């Protein structure tokens, strides 16, 4: 029981975490990230693009003409989202299949030979953590207690989705293992049959050779 409580607490900590980082790319470079997402889960991507200024030797807010093309593909390699956004924005989508979702970003700039550097601030929020509860409380006129209950219910729902996703991964892994074992077995049987046939053919060949030489 204690181990289950510790596991649940650890999972809650993971669910509350978000991915915040920044990275540098050129105006023609493509950068992709892989996010494992359960089905029917909301994902929010916040980003901001800054352009390198050689005069100040730092990064400044990018010009209005520079935007980001964002493309999202699900685990079946189907395009979930693909469009050009401004230099700063908030993107939201809902997963319909569990698994790895690939989020790719690249500048819409056509300055092929400028070599300008861009700094992209990126924050990916998945599941319950992606919900703006302050906005929810204001819209639905919830008290502090009601809002807390709503958060706990969303956390339980997200935990259920995570558990279902883990079972889905285990099932896929088991299917892959069984398929691999089956292929290994059939390959071993095929090798055995080939070796037996080769041995039989060699015995026939040696017998014919000895009979031709009148040794038998």
UniProtKB/Swiss-Prot annotation:
Family listed: Belongs to the EMP24/GP25L family.
Lineage of producing organism: Eukaryota, Metazoa, Ecdysozoa, Arthropoda, Hexapoda
Motif (Prevents secretion from ER): 213-216
UniProtKB keywords: Coiled coil, Developmental protein, Endoplasmic reticulum, Membrane, Signal, Transmembrane, Transmembrane helix
UniProt membrane topology term: Single-pass type I membrane protein
Signal sequence annotation: 1-20
Pfam families to which the protein is assigned, alphabetical: EMP24_GP25L (PF01105)
Entry protein name: Transmembrane emp24 domain-containing protein eca
GO CC term (a single one): endoplasmic reticulum membrane
Record-annotated GOLD domain positions: 30-126
Spans traversing the lipid bilayer: 183-203
């Amino acid at each position: 029981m204690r181990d289950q409580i510790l596991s649940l607490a650890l999972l809650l900590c993971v669910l509350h975490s978000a991915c915040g980082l920044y990275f540098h790319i050129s105006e023609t470079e493509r950068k992709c990230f892989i996010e494992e997402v359960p089905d029917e889960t909301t994902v929010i991507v916040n980003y901001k693009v800054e352009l390198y200024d050689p005069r100040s030797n730092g990064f400044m807010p990018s010009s209005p003409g520079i935007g980001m093309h964002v493309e999202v593909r699900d685990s079946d390699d189907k395009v979930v989202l693909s469009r050009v956004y401004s230099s700063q924005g908030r993107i939201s989508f809902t997963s319909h299949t569990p698994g790895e979702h690939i989020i790719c970003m690249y500048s819409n700039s056509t300055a092929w030979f400028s070599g300008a550097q861009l700094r992209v601030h990126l924050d990916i929020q998945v599941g319950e953590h992606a919900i703006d509860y302050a906005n929810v409380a204001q819209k639905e006129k919830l008290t502090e207690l009601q809002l807390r209950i709503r958060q706990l219910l969303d956390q339980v729902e997200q935990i259920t989705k995570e558990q279902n996703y883990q079972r889905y991964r285990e099932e896929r892994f088991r299917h892959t293992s069984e398929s691999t074992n089956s292929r290994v077995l059939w390959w071993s049987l095929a090798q055995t049959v080939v070796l037996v046939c080769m041995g039989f053919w060699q015995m026939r060949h040696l017998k014919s050779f000895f009979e031709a030489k009148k040794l038998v």
